[in-house]
Amino acid sequence: MTNKPTVVTCGLPYTNGFCHLGHLRTYIPGDFYVRYLRRLGDDIVFICGSDNHGTPIVVTAEAEKTTPRAVSETYHAHFDNVFKSMGIAFDRFGMTDDPTNHHRTVSILQTLIDRGYVYEQTIQQSYCPKCKRFLPDRYVEGTCPYCGKHARGDECDSGCGRHLEPGEILDPVCATCGTKAELREQKHYYFKLSSFRDYLLEYLPTLGGTLNAKNYAIGWVENELKDWCITRMMDWGVKFPGSDDLVCYVWVDAPIGYISFTEEWAKATNNSWQKYWCEGDRVHFIGSDIIYHHCVFWPAMLHGAGYQPPTAVVASGMVTIDGEKFSKSKGNVVWTKEDYLDKGLPADYLRYYLLAYTSHTRELDFSWKEFQARINNELVNTFGNFANRSMSLVKTKFGDVPQVPVEAEIFAEIERSLAAIEESVRAYEFKAAVDGILLLAAYGNSYISNAAPWKLIKEDPQAAAQILKNCLQIVKACALIMQPVMPESSQKLWEMLGYTDKIESRPISDALVPFENTTLGDVKPLFARIEDKQREEMEAVLTKRAEDSKKKAAGKNTMEAVIEPISEEIITIDDVAKLDLRVGRVVKAERVPKTTKLLRLQVDIGTEVRQIVSGIADVYTPEEMVDKKIIVVVNLKPAKFRGEESNGMLFAAGEEASLLVPLKDVPEGTKVH
């Protein structure tokens, strides 16, 4: 138990689409963490809400001929309902477009302005002459100036993953009509992020949570820290103080929502939000794709405005489906409601799978086959089998619960389990925590199998009674510690044990209180197996969705939409001759640490081996790249990506980064004409 009050938040789901499996990788671990620590006695408030601003929502509203607020409310309600169905119990689930967040955002910004951390600057901004409007964020597409991959607005989401400031994107085109964008002057406001470099380098080493978040942020700050444009020219959003035309950039008001939603909760429950945000710990659960927002932008903004920064940031790994990249456009996605809840599958099964499958920071590869295997082997065969065997034997052989004391060795085993599980939870090692819970059930399974009370019942009923009473104590402990993982199933088990209260009202320490009931409830199998037929039906849904997406893409006239406009700038043969293109062979490939999209390649170009850093890790594995022959620009000025020097550039086509390779085998270093 910790005496400090703690506010735990989860990254805000964006109200421009439905909830999918990737979302749950953040919310279920957050819910588990809160549930477990609360039942250890910690004072925790659990906060989330929906992110309602930004250009994608406006684009959707325009396409659907409705308002951004209406779009936001629709998806807000969807996420709220799905979270409740999945047993994710926030104390407050707010909206960033609600008045409390507008007020808190303006207040924080005004403080930053008053303290000299915000300045005005005229910049070159993309403008569509056909649509007659400036193109903030997702209204513009083009080329990333850092890695050369296709980028959208404020982020290179198909390449190096860098945040892009307004005006940085190269070869900009209007995302709405495809017209080549013009650059026009526009006044915007910048946050002096560069002024916080020393503060961040002092603060980040003290940040708790998962190492992937801390290390990624430190690398980012050490590499470069540019000032941050915090305004956009649009109507939808929080109005920037003193401006009629500008709103705040969505990544300004979105995290402020954590504070605003806590305010709303405090007002509704007669509590103090300052108790948690000023005096307590502040823990953020997020996806690894938004680390720099939460570990760089957010703490700098808070520090500048006089607020306390995050105490810990817990960043989950990404999700793949059957070994393939998660992709909504390609149909490689599992929708939480449509594919899971609407099929009648228990929320507890998915909660267990996502927590138990792998370490929180590692990539989680989802497959229905693995899902079936884990549920059947671990829940049905181990946990459920032990609980059912223990209680059924008591009812059939004794009727009432044997009135003998539980042996000391059983309490010692439970106590060891409780200590190990608590240590894992507080260290954000959720797989280890769930493994610890299952190990206690496995211990019980082994204990009852070795003791075989069904054989002893005739020759030594007292010994059989002792064994079964010991087993009931273990079942009770398992129910209590499994509740944060599987709330509904644990309540059912609790009632089978003869209890009538809510299991969530009991502290974890009750696992060491002797089992006191004299009778058991109605004992039934706790878990149902996932049969092959059901698993095959789920796999068929996924396969059909992927096939339908391919057909849809093939049926469209996609050429104009996908192919970028041909440049109007004319070059000469002399310009082309400046490029020294050579055939290279990749001799070594590895992922760049603390990144999700960068590969570090060692490429033999005939005369030497060079290091090239490329944003293709989401398309090619390091193993796929080794021995591959590629075309390399060898006279390109060296550049740095995430602190790694890149001495050359390879060629790739489209968002899928299809590599340009020689059709015939030619020696390394061969010049391309």
Swiss-Prot record:
GO CC terms, sorted: aminoacyl-tRNA synthetase multienzyme complex; cytosol
Name the SUPFAM superfamilies on file. Anticodon-binding domain of a subclass of class I aminoacyl-tRNA synthetases (SSF47323), Methionyl-tRNA synthetase (MetRS), Zn-domain (SSF57770), Nucleic acid-binding proteins (SSF50249), Nucleotidylyl transferase (SSF52374)
What protein name is recorded for this chain?
Methionine--tRNA ligase
Q: What is its EC number?
A: 6.1.1.10
Domain tRNA-binding intervals: 575-673
Q: Where is this motif: 'HIGH' region?
A: 13-23
The UniProt entry, under CDD domains, shows: Anticodon_Ia_Met (cd07957), MetRS_core (cd00814), tRNA_bind_EcMetRS_like (cd02800)
Q: Which organism is it from?
A: Methanocorpusculum labreanum (strain ATCC 43576 / DSM 4855 / Z)
Q: Does the keyword Electron transport apply?
A: no
Principal place of residence: cytoplasm
- Supply the alphabetized keyword list: Aminoacyl-tRNA synthetase, ATP-binding, Cytoplasm, Ligase, Metal-binding, Nucleotide-binding, Protein biosynthesis, RNA-binding, tRNA-binding, Zinc
Gene (name only): metG
Q: Which InterPro entries match?
A: Anticodon_Met, Met-tRNA-synth_bsu_C, Met-tRNA_ligase_1, Met-tRNA_synth, Methionyl/Leucyl_tRNA_Synth, MetRS_core, MetRS_Zn, NA-bd_OB-fold
Record's family? Belongs to the class-I aminoacyl-tRNA synthetase family. MetG type 1 subfamily.
